Each structure stands twice: as structure tokens, then as C-alpha cells.
């Protein structure tokens, strides 16, 4: 059984229609869809934590969602983005999970082991979703999230017409089938004393703090790509003499300018320089280039996986 949980409260919105596309994708299987707009679920409160002793006193049917998920072959969450966070229905769902699992670690582990994918209707790609969704998968997993930006398909997010675009629907089918265009990129983590070379670039029309990185060309090594991309994006010259080492790669999923689903593997390489060059932004998408104090970077960076990566890089640069 495939379970779809639509957290939107809109009856005819994009999330509802995306759920219909998911059902069509799995037409050879049994699909169970839970629409939050069809029920009124109660948030936690006005109780004495009975769920930690015996059982939750609320009986509004929300446990049926959890029961279906733990019996499913795969579960897909469909969520709207409200102010760069999942909507309140999702957090209500999180809260009420205590009443279902009731301290049963085996049941919780079974839930976490169920294959899950997440579709977010959003005009941004916020790390807040990764942080919120990580509680629904195992610790060693990365949440597989598809962000669908209505603007990319010339649609108004409020009209619920996103699925009228054939390319948008096709991307959902590709996502559910894990049909990605694979790309590889090299990232240059460049340290100068207690500072790190950073870029600010436009991502979904928002300035985003990042690090120099780019596509590995055919026949090019990861090291050569990192050195080249660093110069092309920031005008900073680094060489193999500045190279310290490499840390574990990570993956990101996104929709490219041709409206194709891409899985990009990024290889972070560490460099250390003794004297910085004259920095300049050399690509239109890059707004600013500068060396930031590492502590300031960690405070301003919105991606937890990048923060962890930088901490690891710092331990290797010495």
C-alpha cells in the first residue's frame, strides 16, 4: 500500500491535486490518501500527559494515519510552505505522534524505516523543512525532498493550477520513480586564518550564503574543478599546494532551468592560503564574495549539513 498524507487545509489547492497525480503514478497499487482538510484534528493540550502513561485521551482518528504509514510500502508527505516552514497541520501531526508511539521503540523504529518522500509546494528551498522532516526518517538518512516552485512554471501559487502544467506533473513522476539527471560538482572550502571564503548567490530569487562550487567538466578531476570554480566565481587563486584534503560528499535535489529533476553530488575539498587575493564577483548570479569569520559563517548559514561539514573541515585544516 502507498500512503499519501496531504497536510494542506485547502480542498482544491496544489497539494490536493499533487496527491491525485501520486495516485495516478501508482495506479497499479493500492493508494490511501489522507487529506487534512477532510477532518478536524485536535492539537496537544488541556491534558495531564496521559499519552506518556497509558494512552492519549483524544480520539479524532489521527492514529489511523500513523497505523497506515507503518503498514505501508512507501509514504509520501505533501506539504505547503508557510513562511519557510511546514504548515501548522504538520506540527500538530508531530505532536500527536507521542500518543501513537507511546514510548514503543519498536513501533517507532518501524515507522522510521518506512520509505518516505516529501513534496513541498514552495517558492523557496528552505532548510527548515529538512530540519522538520528529519524526525520522520532514520538518523543516517537524508530526507528526499522535492520543492515545487509555482513561478518556475508560470503559475500563481494561490490558484491551485500547478498540476495543469505538463512539465510540473512530469517532474513529480520522475521524483516518485527516482529518475534523476545526475551531476557532480566540486566545492572549494578555502580557509584564510580563522576566515572562510564565501559567496552570496541568488537561489529562488533570494540571497543565499554559500561556498565556491561548480560542475566537474568531462575529464576533469575533482581537485582541478574546485580550483577552477574558485577562481571563476571569486577571482581567488588557489593551487594544489594549498590543498589539504577532502571530506564526505553530500547530495542535493533540485529542478534546473530546463525544468528537469537533478540529483547533484557535491565533493567538498579543503584549501588553506596564507595571503588572500583581490576578490571579485565574476558571475551574474553571485551577488557578493568575501572572507567571513568562521563563527559568523556558522551563525548565518541556514543549512545544518553545511555547518557540520565546515566543522569537520576545520578539524582537518590544522
Question: How should each PLM-predicted stretch be described?
Answer:
Residues 107-115, 137-140:
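Short, conserved loop/helix-junction motifs that constitute active-site signature segments
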